[in-house]
A protein has these predicted regions:
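N-terminal accessory regions of nucleic-acid-interacting proteins
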Residues: 1-24
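Short, charge-rich binding segments
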Residues: 18-21, 36-39, 77-82
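Two-metal-ion RNase H-like nuclease active-site motif
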Residues: 25-34
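RNase H-like nuclease fold core
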Residues: 33, 37-52, 57-58
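Conserved DEDDh/DEDDy metal-dependent 3′-5′ exonuclease domain
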Residues: 56-144
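C-terminal or mid-to-C-terminal helical accessory/interaction module adjacent to the motor/catalytic core
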Residues: 146-148
Length: 148
């Protein structure tokens, strides 16, 4: 497994408190796979962002082979166990179920229990007409929210 890390300045975090969130509690995550079925596809990337030491830390876990999936899962869930809120984009429909199926396939005991999930796609979708977005792809939502 290859681990890549990069730090970014935190900027103004006041918007988080207005939403009832604390940066230290959050973990943003996304996965990349070779397909949609956890039984047939492979997990090759878990990306996460956490607030650490006054900066945002981006961590990417890359699989070099199929055998790296277990190590990636264990590493990610060790990080997740220190956080209270999980933020994703369409994570509740794809990323979380995909990882849960892999955990089950490998007989691993890690889980998402005790972590509150906030799926940005699910939160934005009901406001489709109000927001007048061209579509609900991640890039369109990022632009609307002012995220680079």
């Amino acid at each position: 497994m290859i681990i890549k890390e990069e730090y970014f300045p935190s900027g103004d975090l006041s918007f988080l408190s207005q939403l009832g969130l604390r940066a230290e509690e959050l973990i943003f995550f996304d996965i990349e796979t070779t397909g949609l079925s956890a039984h047939k596809a492979s997990l090759y990337l878990i990306g996460s962002v956490v607030y650490e030491g006054g900066s945002w830390k981006l961590q990417q876990l890359f699989a070099e082979s199929l055998t790296d999936e277990i190590e990636m899962l264990e590493h990610f869930f060790a990080l997740l166990s220190k956080k209270r809120r999980l933020l994703s984009f369409n994570g509740e429909r794809f990323d979380i179920p995909f990882l849960e199926k892999l955990l089950s396939q490998y007989g691993l005991s890690e889980s998402f229990q005790g972590v509150e999930s906030l799926d940005l796609y699910r939160e934005l979708r009901p406001a489709k007409k109000l927001l007048s977005l061209p579509n609900y792809q991640l890039k369109s939502c990022e632009r609307f929210l002012g995220i680079r």
